[in-house]
């Protein structure tokens, strides 16, 4: 039986830090679902469809990654996808408290759902989609932090 994992997030937009995490997850699991949350409560720069397309392009080189959008409760989505592992990236101690709360709630809702936390490579440990967008809005160079297709899409949005 295949070991299926879900790496959920808003990915607005997907960064090289996210790519680092999903790439490493593909070495641990047979199938990784990059699950892009609709996040209606967040004001996203990119639509769900745009985020899915950008992530599909950025992960096309990874053979065992499937990119899907979702708007369901994470535990329900995981159950429907026959996944028993959630992948989460932890950049700093500040991420841990929130992620721990999510992990406990998800486990309450779906007891067989395990959360696996991966630390990004040092090179990406300080970046976030929000920070990259903010720097780009002020004409800072963010080429190093984004896949090329995502960089081009971000520049087009900001033009």
UniProtKB/Swiss-Prot annotation:
Its EC number is 2.7.7.3. GO terms for cellular component: cytoplasm. It catalyses: (R)-4'-phosphopantetheine + ATP + H(+) = 3'-dephospho-CoA + diphosphate. One of its GO terms (biological process) is coenzyme A biosynthetic process. The record marks 18 as: Transition state stabilizer. GO terms for molecular function: ATP binding; pantetheine-phosphate adenylyltransferase activity. Pathway: Cofactor biosynthesis; coenzyme A biosynthesis; CoA from (R)-pantothenate: step 4/5. It is found in: Cytoplasm. It is an enzyme of class 2 (transferase). Reversibly transfers an adenylyl group from ATP to 4'-phosphopantetheine, yielding dephospho-CoA (dPCoA) and pyrophosphate. This is Phosphopantetheine adenylyltransferase. It comes from Shigella dysenteriae serotype 1 (strain Sd197). The lineage of its organism: Bacteria, Pseudomonadati, Pseudomonadota, Gammaproteobacteria, Enterobacterales.
């Amino acid at each position: 039986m295949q070991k299926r994992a879900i790496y959920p997030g808003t990915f607005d937009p997907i960064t090289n830090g996210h790519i680092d995490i999903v790439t490493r997850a593909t070495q641990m699991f047979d199938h990784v679902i990059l699950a892009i949350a609709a996040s209606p409560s967040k004001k996203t720069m990119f639509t769900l469809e745009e985020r899915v397309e950008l992530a599909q392009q950025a992960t096309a080189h990874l053979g065992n990654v499937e990119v899907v959008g979702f708007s369901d409760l994470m535990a329900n989505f995981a159950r429907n996808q026959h996944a028993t592992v959630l992948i989460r990236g932890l950049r700093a101690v500040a991420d841990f408290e929130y992620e721990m709360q999510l992990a406990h709630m998800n486990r309450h809702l779906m007891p067989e759902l395990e959360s696996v936390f991966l630390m990004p490579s040092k090179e990406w440990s300080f970046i976030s989609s929000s920070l990259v967008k903010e720097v780009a809005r002020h004409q800072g160079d963010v080429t190093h932090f984004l896949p090329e297709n995502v960089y081009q899409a971000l520049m087009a949005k900001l033009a």
